[in-house]
Amino acid sequence: MKTNFTVLFAIIIFSSVPFLRGDTFSFRADSMTGGKATGREITVLTGNAEVRSDKLLLQAERIEIQGSDNRFIDCIGNVRGMEEEKNILFQTDRLRYDRTLKIARLEGNSTLEDRKNEIVARSRFIEYNDSQEIAIFQISVRLFKDNLVCRSEYAIYRRQEKTLALSGFPVVYKKDDEFRANRIQVDLNTDDVAMEGDVKGSIIN
């Protein structure tokens, strides 16, 4: 029989599990299994699973919480997440999160939406460093912003600087204009493009 453990989970978390200082942590799901054997601490949440770690909210079909101080979170199946303070949304097949380093790794069909900067990016792998506000995208990278469309196999997005570095057959489309090179740097404030190596382009006047 499955039971909603929301209240029970809160009791377990706040009464018996050590925390990272200054980090609020809670979780809920339809069912739970777990153990606290030394060196093998693991809690498995299934069915409408949800974890909140400070400003980060994660939801998935299954979530595994492991390690001392619940350091590692592994979300599997229809994963959705939101960094509430920065207004960043995630969607992916699988997400692994390190609460100490504040690094999220998204695997499979993955989307990152930065609502503040009005950017949507998709790829097969995303690594987001929340402390540095840097995202790395790999494999079938697509980034959309207003009339700007960027494609490549590898990209680095620096959120604070609002810059995008593209490599691996990069292409940038600005309305009807097209730019290709070995490496392309995009200023997302102005949509200006800087290119290096085998530069090609077409501009519609």
Segments the model singles out, each with a brief description of its role:
Residues M1-N205:
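Mature-chain termini and adjacent capping regions
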